[in-house]
Regions:
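Short acidic, S/G/P-rich loop/turn micro-motifs used as interaction or catalytic elements
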Residues: 39-43, 72-74, 111-116, 146-151, ...
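Conserved P-loop NTPase "ATPase switch" module shared by AAA+ and STAND
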Residues: 134-151
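Glycine-rich, aromatic-bearing surface loops/beta-hairpins
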Residues: 149-202
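Glycine-rich P-loop/Walker A and Walker A-like loops and their local beta1-loop-alpha1 context
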Residues: 2-59, 64
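Residue-level preference for the first positions of well-ordered beta-strands
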Residues: 30-33, 137-141, 169-171
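A short, acidic, amphipathic alpha-helical segment used as a generic capping/interface helix at domain edges
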Residues: 17, 116-133
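A short acidic (Asp/Glu
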Residues: 42-49, 75-80, 150-156, 181-185
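Long, charge-dense
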Residues: 65-115
Length: 202
């Protein structure tokens, strides 16, 4: 059986007036995962933008916050230092090398999994959801977990971000599939089960 398409996701869930209320759905952890074939990455990204356009139309009036977790990590690194050097600058210097030095890999892993980075995303989300607007604000959509791998996994992000998800619904787009109680990034790499998040399209 084919999995739910993005268009069906909109028709069956996102445009549903009851689901558009932050207090409905999974009340304990209002986080949802949409799985897709990683080969469809750029098509999915285009469709995510289309979702935002459809949700802001008069029949919904919803202003959706969409974030690329990889792009947000790069922005976060702009102000981060490794000694006297900008971490982002060090990465740029090593762009032409076949293999990134282990010291930089370790720093990137630690930064991506840091409380500071999770707070950085939370601050951006709070700014959006608390800013006065005539539009409803219900959804935070996150994608880019294929790009930020191996430094941050979707399961790690969700476990650490759970305490921040209040007053809105978090939707994570996952480039892989769910099978045997576990998520598989790119259909290959094991990612832990995120028990408290709801899989939208099993």
């Amino acid at each position: 059986m084919d999995k739910m398409t993005i268009s069906e996701f909109y028709d069956q869930l996102l445009s549903d007036k009851e689901f558009q209320e932050p207090e409905t759905g999974n009340l304990f952890f209002p986080a949802y995962i949409y799985q897709y074939d990683s080969q469809d990455e750029y098509n999915i990204r285009t469709q995510i933008v289309n979702l935002k356009d459809r949700l802001i139309r008069p029949n919904n009036f919803i202003d959706t916050l969409i974030l690329n977790i990889y792009d947000e990590f790069i922005s976060f690194l702009k102000d981060e230092k490794m000694g006297d050097e900008s971490i982002l600058g060090l990465i740029t210097q090593n762009d032409n090398e076949k293999e990134m030095p282990d010291t930089i890999k370790d720093v990137l892993f630690n930064k991506a999994n840091s409380l500071e980075f999770f707070n950085y995303i939370n601050t951006k989300a709070n700014t959006h959801f608390k800013e006065p607007s005539e539009l409803k604000k219900v959804y935070l959509m996150l994608y880019g977990f294929g790009s930020i791998f191996p430094f941050l996994r979707a399961s790690t992000y969700l476990k650490n971000f759970e305490e921040h998800v209040k007053g809105y619904k978090l939707i994570v787009f996952f480039p892989g599939y769910y099978e045997n109680n576990n998520y598989h990034l790119f259909g290959e790499f094991h990612d832990e089960n995120i028990y408290r998040a709801t899989l939208i399209n099993p």
